[in-house]
Amino acid sequence: LDNIPKHMQDAVIASEDRRFYDHWGLSLRSVARAIGINILSLSYRQGFSTLTQQLARNLYKTIGFEDSILRKIKEVITAVQIERTYTKDEILEMYLNTVHFGHGTYGVEAATKRFYGKESKELSVDESALLVGLLPSPASYSPIRHPDRARKRRNTVLRLMRDQGYISHNEHAQYRAMTLEAVNELPMRGKAPYFTEYVRRLLEKEDEALDI
């Protein structure tokens, strides 16, 4: 976790789970809000996943990703077990190293190299906010395919960071004005660059097909 910038950690918590350090794997406030929305809409529209629940899905694929109450129950049970076993910092580190950022990348380090061509420790605040903005739907907010959407989503993350005290109003205005500098195509490395590129493109097609 020491190699991941503090502002990246802050951006994830501000955007994905603001009560991360206060709950035990399940946020009762989020559950109550989600239940209210689902009852009013007479359907399953609002989820209530904490960071730990998201990690549970990432680590244990048998939990599944479908929108159902059964999946949520399995997810919550696994999340509570994770919270009992690991510290909050360990959970955050595992999450950041396994979460999907789109374009065939998993984890902050791989995503930073894919979009910016550098190491995660070199990320600026606005760059971290853009990467975190991808998490709800990497295909929809891809800075390569949908730069306008990506910028708006990045600004939403920056606003959340400002509102929760992670950055000042002046910093928010400064970072919000930054243009996107995503790297479209990185030079291929390794002994089989064309095969690697072929696999990467297959993964990107899967992302688009699943809208993730």
Predicted regions and their residues:
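A short N-terminal beta-strand-loop micro-motif at the entrance of redox/enzyme domains
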Residues: L1-P5, I82-R84
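Flexible, acidic/glycine-enriched loop-and-adjacent beta/alpha segments
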Residues: N3-L51, E109, Y116
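Non-catalytic, structured segments within soluble enzyme domains
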Residues: S43-I212
